Amino acid sequence: MSLRAFEQQNVAALQVKFLSHSQISNITMPGHFGQKVLKTLGLNDHAHQQNSSAVRLPGRPAVNNDERGLSSPPNNGTYPRLCRLSDGTILSSFTRFPDGQRSLRVAKSTDNGLTFEDFSEVTRAAGDVDNMFLCEVAPGTILAAFRNHDMGPNGPTHFRITVCRSTDGGRVWQFASQAAEKRPPLGIWEPFMRVGRQGEVQLYFSQEFAHNNQCTMLVVSRDQGSTWTQPTCLHGDQDPLRDGMCGIARTFDNGREALLMVFETTRYGPFSVEALLSYDDGATWGWRHEVFRPRQGHNAGSPQIASFADGSMATIFMTDEDSNHVEWVKNASIKVVFASQPVEGRVQWSSPTLISPASSFWPGIMALDHHNVLATYDRGGPLAKTITWHPA
């Protein structure tokens, strides 16, 4: 469904449905608006804190004018993500909406992300399946994690983070496990996976604890996704903030390996982007700090992060800060900020650079090599362009 058609069918209904809710409400609808709706009525005003244009970086980033599609023509779909395999293949993943259903699809690139061809379907359902994320856990063995919610006439009736597995490089998929599941009304969303130092699979997801509290959770698998530990809340279980949509990249702090997690949150009412650091491979997190706050009354969310060979980082996100009319997630553009390695837990982020104009949605990012990353987003279909890091 096109963005314009989706807006016409759903925006009016959304405004009525959420008018009596608190400032943040989760919805599970198809298309570009199937993540979160933010109501900004009655919020306190906060001063806008500009990211410093004087941040000194150990290199010069360049956004390249080389946009390409992430699937076969006509290249439709949303929520694009990328996964590099050990044989050099790159898989893209995205959600399509055939015949009133949802289809989680995979496309394949064998030329380092220059071109992609449709490759496989992980699952298809009439329920709310979306937010797919791929991770290779052994050569040729790939996990696909995604939200998989049963829907009734009044909303979700069961929440799941489902995991499927492929052992042939992503061509054929089979059910592996439920990494997490729960009953309504409080939901779970937005899985992210990485492989830890000991070869274990770490799966992070967002879980609601109250209407004004959502946290990042972690489950771990040591059998390539067949079974998972009980969920652990990593931070903020008592905070009146809605942290979500996390992404993680590896970096260094004075030679010590570190992980940096970015996520959207609601510290100022509308969404902004913050981060946490871990020095024990994701077991514990701290050193919380701001990555990007848009101008007053506007939003920045859905972040993802990748790092370069020298430990410098690029965080991509969507924001409506350039729009005069705030109706999140409409009117969003895609931007990126950069930072050098942390220094004793401190990170300084640059001012933002535009990647894709409005209306663009649900960005992702993946390292291509030591000095290039591939940034993804949905602007009428899953697209990508490269960002090059020129070390000083």
Residue ranges of model-derived segments:
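Asp-box/BNR beta-propeller blade signature and adjacent active/binding-site loops
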Residues: V37, G42-A392
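Low-complexity, intrinsically disordered flanking regions
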Residues: M1-V55
